[in-house]
Amino acid sequence: MCHGRIAPKSTSVFAVASVGHGVFLPLVILCTLLGDGLASVCPLPPEPENGGYICHPRPCRDPLTAGSVIEYLCAEGYMLKGDYKYLTCKNGEWKPAMEISCRLNEDKDTHTSLGVPTLSIVASTASSVALILLLVVLFVLLQPKLKSFHHSRRDQGVSGDQVSIMVDGVQVALPSYEEAVYGSSGHCVPPADPRVQIVLSEGSGPSGRSVPREQQLPDQGACSSAGGEDEAPGQSGLCEAWGSRASETVMVHQATTSSWVAGSGNRQLAHKETADSENSDIQSLLSLTSEEYTDDIPLLKEA
């Protein structure tokens, strides 16, 4: 104001004021933004001994801004001291605020010591079961062969193979079935039924008397061939019994022949000589029979 008048403003001052006001406003805005940005960045989280951390989302961004989440992990054989293992960046700080550390896992050693015996028990049980199954399979496979071998041994014992036993340290050979029944010389053929021979001798004429005698001779010869010093007791008894039957048959023939000779005394001399030769053959057959049956021969002659 000059002498009651208002002086006009200088244009240069107005220009400086206008420029200063235009520059200050952006600076204020920039400072505000920088302050907010610096306040939202969190420092690096503490890393525990024998452990570490991972970021969510991965990978970890630098710097760790607000909203970043980290997860703590421990090395093998260690575990976190607390149950909570996640931290979140809020307003430049990690929330919740707590101390993170990894400690030695004592339960792991116990589990390891208990696992070794358990594994050995399981292995031994599995081996035992496998061995039992193998034995069962072998028994099933070998059972037919064992049965066939048993039958073959039994058949050999019946068919005549000698079986030996030990008696007071001495090996004694047992006789086979055939040797025990028939003797060591073989089979002894039984003679024909004497009753059939009696009927033939009674129904035949002078020319038919030689038939029963010829049938008796091979039988007696078969039994006599089995005799001797090496004859088995079983065969001796059988042959003696068959010889007694033959002697009885021959004696009946002799009695029949004697009665026939007495009834035909006036026949020709040739028939008489034939009867005498037949009687001599019968006497020779009787001499081959057993001594224990000789007492019955006179009774048959008297009859």
Curated annotation (Swiss-Prot):
Disulfide bonds join C42-C89, C74-C102. Residues 142-303 are cytoplasmic. One of its GO terms (biological process) is DNA damage response. CDD domains: CCP. It is a single-pass type I membrane protein. The chain crosses the membrane at residues 121-141. Residues 40-104 form the Sushi domain. It is found in: Membrane. It holds the Pfam family Sushi. Residues 1-39 form the signal peptide. Keywords: Disulfide bond, Membrane, Signal, Sushi, Transmembrane, Transmembrane helix, Tumor suppressor. Induction: Up-regulated by chemotherapeutic DNA-damaging agents and by p53/TP53 and/or by p73/TP73 in response to cytotoxic insults. Up-regulated by lipopolysaccharide (LPS) in monocytic THP1 cells. Up-regulated in umbilical vein endothelial cells (HUVECs) cultured in THP1 monocyte LPS-induced medium. Residues 40-120 are extracellular. InterPro entries: SUSD6, Sushi/SCR/CCP_sf, Sushi_SCR_CCP_dom. The keyword Transmembrane applies. Residues 199-237, 263-282 are annotated as: Disordered. The keyword Cytoplasm does not apply. GO terms for cellular component: membrane. May play a role in growth-suppressive activity and cell death. May be involved in the production of chemokine molecules in umbilical vein endothelial cells (HUVECs) cultured in THP1 monocyte LPS-induced medium. Plays a role in preventing tumor onset. This is Sushi domain-containing protein 6. It comes from Homo sapiens.
